[in-house]
Amino acid sequence: MKKELLKLASKHGTPLFIVDHDVIRKNYRTFKKNLPRIQCYYAVKANSNQEIVKTLFDEGSSFDVASYNEFMQIYRYIRHFEEKAKDFYIWDKIIFSNTIKDMQTLRDIKKYRPLVTYDSEDELKKIAKHCETAGLVLRLKVPDTGSQVEMSSKFGAEPGDGYNLIKKAFDLGLVVEGLSFHVGSQCTNFDNYTTALSIASEIFNHARKKGYNLKIIDIGGGFPVPYDSQVPKFEKLAAVINSEMERLFPSDIEIIAEPGRFMVATSAMLVSKIIGKARRGGKIFYHINDGVYHTFSGVVYDHWIPNFSSFRKGKKEVCAVVGPTCDSFDKISVSEQLPGNLQIEDYLFTENIGAYSIASTTKFNGFDGAKILHLNN
């Protein structure tokens, strides 16, 4: 693998973000195999690269979008469909999972009659005024203890308010199709899922008894990626979810999920180049041509700890790897085990960097983002 990476870096330049679409296909099929009852809605926010979206579209994935622009990314593939097929696709294959939408977005999507989430009475009033054609899914606040990125501090209605928010929606002339939750990104605490499913089932059953025919449960994302050997196996989580769904929910409802990281994290690696070397405070600093304002933005926004590997062998020591910008904040890692004999112009590579990386790249200091190379697309 190293020889091939060196060839690609030499040919295309660095930083080079390499995406293997066969890995994306494998991840999608693994998800479907282990959770056969669940319809997969890829969370576009994880990596919105159009080639990646196209691969998942071709695999049959549905999509979780957060904005009008993300919606239009998917719409471009169905623009040529007959009207009935187009309407069905939007209704069955796209969900606006952002619980807060500005009024213009609601007006823009009204004609498409999409499925949208909400978690407050004020959002209901906006939807009733500007997008009454939408189907609704109530987002619930659930525990996210132990997840890499928590969600519940910003999103989700308190479970105790759940039924009233369903009733309020119907009182406004809207239709609530189901419930959703998110246990936090990169969730390795499987109790979060069992607790969330239990919370959702109580509200679901209460609403049905009151005559509100809910028929969708959206279990969100959070499916863990094997960044290291300590991460529990996805197959183990899938078994837990399958068992709880069978126990708690009737067989006639639709179960959906919003995996993002799970689909793309392991599909990409980055080759970067050492552009400077210095010893500071007794520690070697390797300055590379990518950083936290670019492909390593996940260090900041995603609480992700990257791994670096070198092509040159040597005695390892604790080093710092920092980005190219003039901001001292641009430190990727200050405790990386790397050979101390690496030289300027040597390459480093980082695996499992497909999610929440190029999605939040900036042009800070005038530095461009990594070149993107697609394999097997």
Task: Please identify what each model-predicted range represents.
Residues 142-276, 338, 365:
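Active-site loop/helix belt of alpha/beta enzymes
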Residues 97, 139, 182, 220-222, ...:
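Generic beta-strand/beta-sheet core signal
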Residues 42, 63-66, 96, 117-120, ...:
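General beta-strand structural signal in soluble alpha/beta enzymes
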Residues 135-141:
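ATP-grasp fold ATP-binding core
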